[in-house]
Amino acid sequence: MPADVVFRPPRIRSKPRLMGIQSALVVGPPGEEIYTDKYGRIKVQFPWDRKGKKDDKSSLWIRVATPWAGKQWGMIHIPRIGNEVIVSFLEGDPDRPIITGMLFNADNMPPYGLPDNMTQSGIKTHSSKNGSDDNFNEIRFEDKKDEEEIYIHAERDLNCVIENNETRKVGFDDKKDGDQSVEIYNNQTLK
């Protein structure tokens, strides 16, 4: 063997594998509520990490799985600091962790009191930075028989862009609370 070649014994053992899933806590720098990079990755601390400080140095960036992802389109929900997440490992490789879900727990309860509201489903966000439990956006579906409802709450503004036609059918009353101002920039025809 030439003197300038470093001797390395052959690898006898295969790379370790992590099968199954683990839970972890989303972490970031002090004072932040959301911490991510341009790819939507986050940092976590595993419960077995006794030396971690639950900050932005607790792990490397970890990718977050989503049901739908493409070039400049898809779904995005960045787990926030303090959320409990599920971590899997691609092909069992401990160097390739991926966030595959989030969990409710005693510190982060579901948005609708259960089991009383078990017929409700939806999306409820939390205003950031420093929003309270009263600051949120929400789309909620009530599926209880004879009380079915789709509820939309915008904490501030609701903007709707319709590129073509809008058709609505209101079976009974069409109520608008508060003052209203209507601006028409071109023509309007009422029948």
Task: Tell where the protein language model's regions lie, with residue ranges.
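Structural signature for extended repeat/solenoid scaffolds and their inter-repeat hinge/linker regions
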Residues: 3, 18-191
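OB/S1-fold single-stranded nucleic-acid-binding modules
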Residues: 1-18
